């Protein structure tokens, strides 16, 4: 197994992974044009020619035969060019002594608290390879 930086040459393999992942993995779109643009950004990021706001690092996992079987990525600083939304888990309390009511309700709050933080993205391992702890390499 080998983890390495993704390149434009990995486009066909990443497109196949994106198709396998389906629409739920929004950071790995099943669009050849979008993936190619992203891979160009990835190459520029590893070359050190982009600012933190634009840097996007994508890795691929190869098996012993050289086949790309998984991917993971890191955005250097999420949300510096477009909004980066996340959820914060909080608590909503409803109380009334007169009605003898006290209730705590776990609540998700939409925030931008992680703006500027690094973010893991595009984490996917092809179904036939989800064994032997290969996912830990990603």
Predicted region positions:
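Residue-level detector of conserved, well-ordered beta-strand and adjacent loop positions
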Residues: 4-7, 62, 75, 121
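Active-site rim helix/loop that mediates acceptor-substrate recognition in acyltransferases
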Residues: 18, 22-69, 73-81
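A short, internal acetyl-CoA/4′-phosphopantetheine-binding micro-motif in the GNAT/acyltransferase core
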Residues: 62, 120-131
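Conserved acyl-donor/pantetheine-binding loop and adjacent beta-alpha core of acyl/acetyltransferases
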Residues: 76-122
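Conserved glycine-rich acetyl-CoA-binding loop
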Residues: 113, 126-137
């Amino acid at each position: 197994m080998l983890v390495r930086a993704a390149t434009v040459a990995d486009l066909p393999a990443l497109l196949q992974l994106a198709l396998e992942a389906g629409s739920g993995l929004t950071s790995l779109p099943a669009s050849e044009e979008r993936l190619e643009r992203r891979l160009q950004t990835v190459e520029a990021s590893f070359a050190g020619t982009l600012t933190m706001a634009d840097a996007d690092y994508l890795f691929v996992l190869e098996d012993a035969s050289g086949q790309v079987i998984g991917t993971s990525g890191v955005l250097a600083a999420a949300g510096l060019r477009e909004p980066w939304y996340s959820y914060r888990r909080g608590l909503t309390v409803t109380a009334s002594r007169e009605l003898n009511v006290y209730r705590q309700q776990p609540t998700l709050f939409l925030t931008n608290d992680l703006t500027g933080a690094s973010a893991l993205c595009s984490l996917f391992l092809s179904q036939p390879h989800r064994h032997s702890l290969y996912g830990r390499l990603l």
